[in-house]
Structure formats: C-alpha cells, structure tokens
UniProtKB/Swiss-Prot annotation:
Residue span of motif 'HIGH' region: 42-52
GO molecular function: aminoacyl-tRNA deacylase activity; ATP binding; leucine-tRNA ligase activity
Main location: cytoplasm
Gene: leuS
HAMAP family: Leu_tRNA_synth_B
Protein name, per record: Leucine--tRNA ligase
Length: 814
C-alpha cells in the first residue's frame, strides 16, 4: 500500500461509493432510536467560505458519531435561496437572480459534497423552489385566517435619491446612508403585513424544554422584555389624555416632566407656535435614527430633546409638568410617552441635568431623609417620601397602593408591557415569496384560493429602484379577479421577509416531495423536535425566535405536537484570519477552503477546523496548525498500513489494551459534548503510543489489531475518507460508517497501579507506586518503607498520616 495517503485519489473514490451504495439514505421508518440533527442552512452567495466549513463539518462529525452509536440519524442540507444579495447582484450586473442563485447552489452543493458530509441529497430543500414557497404562502393564509397575520401602516427606511425602501443591511455607517448612492436615509410610512408574534410572548419566555446556551435564552428574554407595572393617564392642560406605562408607579409623585416620542400623534397638536420650528427640526432628525441609536446608554453621548411649549398635570401631585420630546422614547415601546422621574431613573436624571429640569426625591434608603440631596439617580427600592398618602410605605407596598388608587379613580390600571413587537414581514423587494393576498374594492382583503398556490414569482421583472415594489410595475401580474365576487382586483405586490423561509424548513426536510401538505404529519410526529441544532449566536433574536413562534403556531393548528422546534442548540464560534481579525477581502486574510482541499484534502481541513480550539469559541487560522494535522493523519495512516522493519522489543499488551479502552471513552465523551479539539488531541496521543508499540512484540497480536481497528473507528466521524481506506486495508468489506461505535470495559479504565507523591510536613520528599485498589493502611506502609522516606522518619514521632485518594500521602512528624 502507498506509504503516504493521497487524498486526491481516495476522497473522490469514497464519495462516489457512498453515493452509489446509498449509505446515507434517509430511512424514516427505521426501528432504531431517531436522532435529527440540523445545521443552519447556508445562503447560496457563490461559494462556501471557511466559516461554512467551520460550522458544518463539526456538525457532520457529531451526526456521524451518533449514527455509529446506533441511532437512525437524519442530517439534511438545503439552501436559504431568497434574499437581498441575489437582487443586488442582479441590479449591479444585469443578471437574472434566479439563474445567479441556482448556479451558486449547484457549485456550493459540489463543495459540500467534497467536505464529505453525511447528507442524503434527495432530501434537499431550496427555499426559492415554487414547491417550497407554495407552503410559505399557505402558512400566510392560515395565519391570516387565525388572526396572526394583519396589515397596518408603519415606518420603513427610505432613500430619497434611489426612490426606494431599503433593507436594514442597505443602511450603512453612523450617519445612516444608502449603500447604493450615499444619500442620507429617511423614514416613510407604508401599509405593511405583520405576524402577531406578541400573541405568544409569555409562552416564548418559557425555556424549560430547551437545552440552549444561557446567553441565547437571556437575549430572547431581554428582547421580549416583559415588564409589570401600570398604565397611568396624565392630561395636557388642554385636556388631551396622555397615557404612560411605568414599572414604578410608586414614584408617580416624583414625575417632574413628561417626554413623548418624536413620532407621538399628540406632538403636532400640543406644540406651541413658538416651539414649532424647533420641534419640527428635531422630529425630522430623530426619525432618521435606528432604535438602537436612540436607546444608546453611552454616557458620553449628549442628551437631546426639545420642549414643545405645553404642560400636563401630574394626576397624583396635581403639579404642572412640562412636556418634552426626546429620541430615547420610542413609539414602539409602551405608549410612546413616559413620566420622567429624574430622582430615580438614570436617563431621566441625565436629561433633567442637561436641560435644568426639576429633580425630586420620592424614595429614601437607610439613613436618608426626604430632604437628602440627590447627587445622582437612585433607582433602588426603599421607603416612599414626599408622596402624600403613601409616605412611609415600602416601594413594593406603595406600588400596589398606587395601582389600586389609580384603578379606583379611573386614572389608570395594572398592565404588562412587552418590548417585543410584532414581526414585520412585508418587503418591497422582488426576490422573495409573493404575498398571497388580493385586494378587491367590493370584498376587501381576500386570500388567494389555496388550490391556486403557489402564486408564482413572475419572470422579466424590472427591479431597478423606482419607489414602488418591483412586482407592482409588472404590466400584467398584479391584475387579477376577486376569488369571491369575480370582479376586478389587484394582488399584493410585496414579498415576504426571508426569515419566513427559515422558520419552518426543518420540518420540510422530512418530506420535501410532499405535494398535499407542507410536510407529512406521520413522519413529523415521529421525528420532531430536532434533537441537535447548530449555528451562529447572531440569530438569537430573529431566526431562532421566529422559528419558536412559527412552531407554536403550527402546534396550535394541529400540525405538530412538540412545543419547541429543537431541543438542543450549540453555537459555534467565529473562525478568524491569521492576524486574529475577522476575515474580509479588504484585509487580505480570507482563507479559501477549495485551495486547502486541493492541497491537503478534505479530511485534513475538517480535522484542523476541529482542532483549532474549543468549537464554541472559535479562533484564528494557523497554517502551522494545519501542517500538524497533516502529520497526524499521515502517522495514523502509517501506523495502520506500514510494517515496521523490526518489532522484537518487549512490549506490554495489557497496557495497550487499557489505552485502547480509555481512548474509546475519551473520544466518545468529547464528541458527545462537541469538544472536538480535545478528542483529536487524545487521538494524537494514542497514535504516538501506537507508533512506539509497533516496534515491540505486541505488533501483530490480537491486541494490536483491536487497537488499530479502534483507531480507525474513532477517526471515522472526523476524517471519514481516510477511515474508509484504513478500514478496507484492515480487511473489512462493509463501510466503516456502517459500523458500531466501539465499546469499552469499565474495569480497564482503572490503572493497575498509580503513582502518589509523599509529603513530609507538607513538602514532597518522594514518590511511591501502589496498586490502584490499595487501601489506606497498605499505602501508608508502602510510603514508610520507601527508601527515600524511611530515613527521614526514622527516630521521629509520627503525629498524623493522611492519604488523599489518588492524589498524595502526607506524613506529619516532629
């Protein structure tokens, strides 16, 4: 056999054989326990970068490992094919986005196959296929019928020069400019579709069935932002009610001014003539900013705002409070108005200091009085002061008392507020799922009949920016007849947010050729939820949250029985350039996986990506590291295939047997917890030991063969091609990937003997070898008889003898 492993020959050979023999074919009806593993599907942007490899190859390793453990594993792959990059490429290069996308899919699929992934490509889904997005449209209609889809006016980013809406990704820089023409981006109100994710807000806060990283559940919890408090009604001096939501109604007497969101509908009505110019200018500037910018807590960022020239009345103190507008108050949170309590809220305090507004203490801590000056905001609970009838109550008691008083006086009510907003799904783009709704002047909004789905995305559409949705400008597509009355009607010309495509694809994988339903329910009932999901943590509050919402909606429709889409989630880290910076073409630090595969082979690239460091942390690329993995696989190859010139040294078969059983346990435990780097480190040490043992008389024995077979089996999930070649070399005809994971004997994991340091008065004076099962008296006896220890204790009084099991012996003398 060749003395060196040639990946350019071996890897294509085995991939062809896997395909021919169908060893990865999905078998939904198998009696084996199921394991459904999914990695987030890629966008077909042109080619796989090293980040795709870093996300996908370890996921493939874990799936292979679970298969060898006896599970019926399903590990599918597909493409998130709709979206902005295809449309941008089409505009820039005068291309058909469909041809661009499907050409990329064909190329990327070849790359994924070269990775050696355990994928049944008959189960592939492509979200731009009409047979896929047909069911996006079907779900939309079901949501509409159930009240989960509705339409309302809302603001979108708008480029006045390009005359079009912009997606979030097209707004760049701190000044929020259009990426196409560099114009300042503004806002525009459009009538758009929403999914009512807020209907599931409380249920989405329940993570009890999820084995997910704490940072992800924390991000979702904060994003949903459930707050308990009260809605309180202030009135302007002109009599207009202004409702605020507060989590601290106990501080109502400390509200010394009010702040409205610049977009609040009362701003225009209440603004005085003297303040109108200043208010209008501030509103125009504020609405250009993102919510993130407006809610920044950066201490160095100056607080901005404008008094509108009007006052409201505090319903508790009856004091006049000035009404301001400021960009840190959002119409999308609460009521779009706040009562400002600068004494006990840091942002209100900074605002009051900036503009010279009154600050009043209404809560004290121990050793403070009602007159103690406020040097900074004090948000902590305490004892209420300067608050009329609730003086002396604790903050918690006062909170309840104020809510009861508000309800009795019809000035407010107990309320729960959420930061979460409903999901805006309308997009004024071309390359997406057409929204299946029809507008009839007689019948109103009517869904496309389900037997007419899919509503196909038309070809020959001019998607150059004009200020309208591209489908609206198609000469015929938008004109139709009402399915209810038969009269003239028009289609909705927006397309869906592409997060719709990725909210349920995990279910479609199970039956991608089903034509009568989005998926085959019997298969879904058996295989759901997903057992293992992998992908980036950047999807915490969009894709992952939207998927959970979609799942609960499907459950309530009777389509699935599971409460959650995936049980276990693992997030991989980010692979960096050699300079430890994020890879980018501008930095010149991008790693091309195709070149690496051509030079080293897919197995080497897979191995290094898992050896580079803890998978959940990521780390910088290191060319020296990949050379080390080349040497490791070469040594593994040689230890199995080469015959040593001499192997007559005396060896210890029992030691090799123990090492073999230990490495089985270690690699299995490590792969189960996605600790790929330590699994590979263990295999490297095992190969080094085998290189030594093969020069002894243990070489060629049953123990040796068991060790080399074990090495091959343990390598199989990590380096699937070379493992096949080694397995065949060892005389096996069936694929290594159809073999069982090797078992280990618990008794062989324990050392026959162990080495213990011996301390005298806390200082190490020697070491002893004892049986691993030795009891304390025999360990003490061995220590006292040791040739180094015995002279040191001779003639001394032994005060104490301490044995720390498996760690040390300490003898105290005087």
């Amino acid at each position: 056999m060749a003395t060196r492993y040639d990946s350019s020959i071996t890897e294509p050979k085995w991939r062809e054989r896997w395909e021919r023999d169908g060893i990865y074919r999905f078998e939904p009806d198998s009696d084996k326990p199921k394991h459904y593993a999914v990695t987030m599907l890629p966008y077909p942007s042109g080619n796989l970068h090293i980040g795709h490899w870093y996300a996908m190859s370890p996921s493939d390793v874990h799936a292979r490992y679970m298969r060898m453990r006896g599970y019926n594993v399903f590990f599918p792959m597909g493409f998130d094919a709709f979206g902005l990059p295809a449309e941008n490429a089409a505009i820039k290069n005068n291309l058909d986005p469909r041809k661009w996308t499907y050409s990329n899919i064909e190329y990327m699929r070849g790359q994924l196959q070269s990775m050696g992934m355990m994928v049944d490509w008959d189960q592939q889904i492509v979200s731009a296929d009409p047979e896929y997005y047909r069911w996006n449209q079907w779900f939309f209609i079901q949501f509409f019928k159930r009240g989960l889809a509705y339409k309302k006016f809302s603001a979108v980013d708008w480029c006045p020069k390009c005359n079009t809406t912009l997606a979030r990704e097209q707004v760049v820089g701190d000044e929020r400019r259009c990426e196409r023409c560099d114009s300042l981006v503004t806002k525009r109100d459009l009538d758009q579709w929403y999914f009512k994710i807020t209907s599931y807000a409380d249920e989405l806060l329940n993570f009890s069935e999820l084995d997910w990283p704490e940072r992800i559940t924390t991000m979702q919890r904060n994003w949903i932002g459930r707050s308990e408090g009260a809605e309180i009604s202030f009135k302007s001096e002109a009599g207009d009610p202004i409702t605020v939501f507060s989590t601290r109604p106990d501080t109502l007497w400390g509200a010394t001014f009010m702040v409205l969101a610049p977009e609040h509908p009362l701003v225009a009505k209440l603004t005085s003539a003297e303040q109108k110019a200043s208010v209008d200018a501030y509103v125009a500037e504020a609405i250009r900013k993102t919510e993130v910018e407006r809610q920044s807590t950066d201490d160095e960022k100056p607080k901005t705002g404008v008094w509108i020239g009007a006052y409201a009345i505090n319903p508790a103190s009856q004091e006049r409070v000035p009404i301001w507008i400021a960009d840190y108050v959002l119409m999308t949170y609460g009521t779009g108005a706040i009562m400002a309590v600068p004494g006990h809220d840091e942002r209100d305090f900074a605002f009051a200091k900036t503009f010279g507004l009154a600050i009043k203490r209404v809560v004290t801590q121990s050793e403070q009085t009602a007159e103690t000056p406020l040097e900074a905001a004090e948000p902590a609970y305490g004892t209420v002061v300067n608050s009329g009838q609730i003086d002396g109550l604790s903050s918690a008691e006062a909170k309840e008392a104020v809510i009861n008083w508000l309800e009795a006086e019809q000035l407010g009510k107990r309320a729960i507020n959420y930061r979460l907003r409903d999901w805006l799904v309308s997009r004024q783009r071309y390359w997406g799922t057409p929204i299946p709704m029809i507008y009839c002047p007689t019948c109103g909004t009517v869904p496309v009949p389900e037997d007419q789905l899919p509503l196909l995305l038309p070809d020959s559409v001019d998607f150059k920016p004009t200020g309208e949705s591209p489908l609206k400008l198609h000469p015929t597509w938008r004109f139709t007849t009402c399915p209810t009355c038969g009269g003239e009607a028009e289609r909705d010309t927006d397309t869906m947010d592409t997060f719709v495509d990725s909210s349920w694809y995990q279910v479609r994988y199970l039956s991608p050729h089903e034509t009568n339903a989005p998926f085959t329910k019997a298969i879904a009932d058996k295989w759901l939820p997903v057992d293992q999901y992998t992908g980036g943590r950047e999807h915490a509050v969009m894709h992952l949250l939207y998927t959970r919402f979609w799942w609960k909606a499907m459950r309530d429709m009777g389509l699935v029985s599971a409460n959650e889409p995936m049980t276990r989630l693992i997030n991989q880290g980010v692979i960096l350039g050699e300079d430890s910076n994020k890879m980018s073409k501008s930095r010149g630090n991008v790693i091309d996986p195709d070149m690496l595969v051509a030079q080293y082979g897919a197995d080497t690239v897979r191995t290094f990506l898992m050896f580079i460091g803890p998978w959940e942390q990521g780390g910088p690329w290191n060319n020296r590291g990949i050379e080390g993995c080349v040497r490791f696989l070469d040594r593994a190859w040689r230890v199995v295939t080469d015959t040593p010139q001499r192997h007559d040294a005396v060896g210890d078969a029992s030691t090799l047997e123990r090492q073999t059983h230990r490495i089985i346990k270690k690699v299995g435990d490590d792969l189960q917890r996605f600790a790929f780097n330590t699994a590979i480190a263990g295999l490297m040490e095992f190969v080094n030991e085998l290189m030594k043992v093969r020069e002894t008389d243990v070489y060629g024995t049953t123990t040796w063969r068991k060790a080399t077979e074990t090495l091959t089996l343990l390598l199989a999930p990590i380096a699937p091609h070379i493992a096949e070649e080694l397995w065949e070399f060892l005389g096996n005809s069936q694929s290594v990937h159809l073999q069982a994971w090797p078992s280990y004997d618990e008794t062989l994991l324990i050392d026959e003997s162990i080495e213990l340091p011996v301390q005298i008065n806390g200082k190490v004076r020697g070491k002893i070898q004892v049986a691993a099962t030795a009891d304390e008296p025999s360990i003490i006896a061995t220590a006292l008889a040791d040739e180094k220890i015995a002279p040191l204790v001779a003639g001394k009084t032994i005060v104490k003898q301490i044995v720390v099991p498996n760690r040390l012996v300490n003898i105290v003398i005087k």
